[in-house]
Design a protein with these regions (language model features):
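Catalytic alpha/beta core of large soluble enzyme barrels
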Residues: 2-150
Length: 150
């Protein structure tokens, strides 16, 4: 996560956490915006600073009528992907990897212990050698905060 941000490169098989968000760095809030989305928004003519601010509160593009559907389908975030789909991706890579695959399975804030147990069981059944789950909002002082993730 953090190293890929510093190096401005992909974080492996992880989907985007958010299209735009505010990151807390040394008690300062900084905007982080996916550069490919920014370029697309400008090229397609729907960019505005006001839109970026709204997207940074939500993280995803869902619910923004001014953004074309084909763009929304490309820029999907980790919270829009089901835990099962996250595990399927990890399992697909695990088939060709001797060691464990590093991948976060994002869970909604309201995820229960049974949801977590189900994710571990599915990962085991799919042949994953390890699994990391993160329930959004479960860790106080999270460096990235979105207003509208459930």
């Amino acid at each position: 996560g953090t190293l890929s941000l510093i190096a401005d490169c992909s974080s492996g098989i992880e989907p985007l956490f958010a299209i735009a968000y505010k990151r807390l760095v040394l008690e300062t809030e900084l905007y982080e915006i996916n550069l490919y989305f920014l370029e697309t928004a400008r090229q397609r003519g729907f960019y505005s600073q006001e839109l970026i601010e709204r997207v940074s509160k939500k993280g995803s593009l869902r619910g923004f009528g001014e953004i074309p559907d084909d763009v929304k389908k490309i820029f999907v975030t980790s919270h829009e992907i089901s835990p099962e789909a996250h595990i399927e991706v990890q399992a697909a890579f695990q088939d060709f990897t001797d060691n464990a695959v590093s991948k976060t399975i994002n869970l909604k804030h309201r995820a229960t212990r049974n949801d977590v147990a189900g994710a571990f069981l599915l990962a085991y059944e799919k042949g994953c050698k390890g699994i990391t789950v993160f329930r959004y909002g479960s860790k106080p002082g999270t460096l990235v905060k979105l207003d509208e993730v459930d």
